[in-house]
């Protein structure tokens, strides 16, 4: 199975949709995704993800399914006065990596500012929802790998968000959440491809074979917009 994690196009956050530039990105994305021969399409319930997704769904004549658990993590807040950002996934990497010990997969929730019981609980909810979603697609999570219950070669796309997408990737790839947040970025309309790598008939392991790909923007002559990058993008 191939899983495509797609961030929505350039957002109009105030109106929960996408900007005129975002519509151009979504159209270019749809042209690219028609070549991927998708079997199923899913989307966050939020307008900017739905409006991005619709271009691809229309191009492929596929019905989409809304997955509420893939909505953006709008309650995951950081201390604006202390860190200069409002969202927890935007905490500067210099803070995360500045101590003697960096967060690991098993203890990230013990490090400030992530040592909030509610944050850990909400992350575990996303992990549980992810596991249930993938089980419906034939892969059962066992530890950090997936048992092939009903393996297949389908290609499925999930249109979602920057913060959520990185958070989901940390679970799929068994990587420390704060290190993923501070080490990667998903541009608007970018496509991240995760192959469920089946080296045996019993097990599959998620393997990222394409991260934050924006080739459709290059092809269309559109710029990458730095939504989520705080400084010195140019």
Task: Show where each model-derived region lies.
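Active-site-proximal alpha-helix that buttresses catalytic centers in soluble enzyme cores
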Residues: 2-68
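Active-site metal-binding loops of divalent metal-dependent hydrolases
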Residues: 9, 162, 212-214
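Amphipathic alpha-helical segments that form well-ordered structural scaffolds
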Residues: 32, 52, 125, 129-133, ...
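Glycine-rich phosphate-binding loop signature in dinucleotide/nucleotide-binding domains
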Residues: 35-37, 137, 141, 147-153
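Short glycine-rich phosphate-binding loop at a beta-alpha junction
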Residues: 39-45, 145, 155-158
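Gly/Ser/Thr-rich loops at beta-strand to alpha-helix junctions
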Residues: 46-48, 162-165
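Phosphate-handling substructures
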Residues: 61-139
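Acidic, low-complexity terminal tails and accessory targeting/binding regions
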Residues: 73-87, 91, 144-155, 166-234
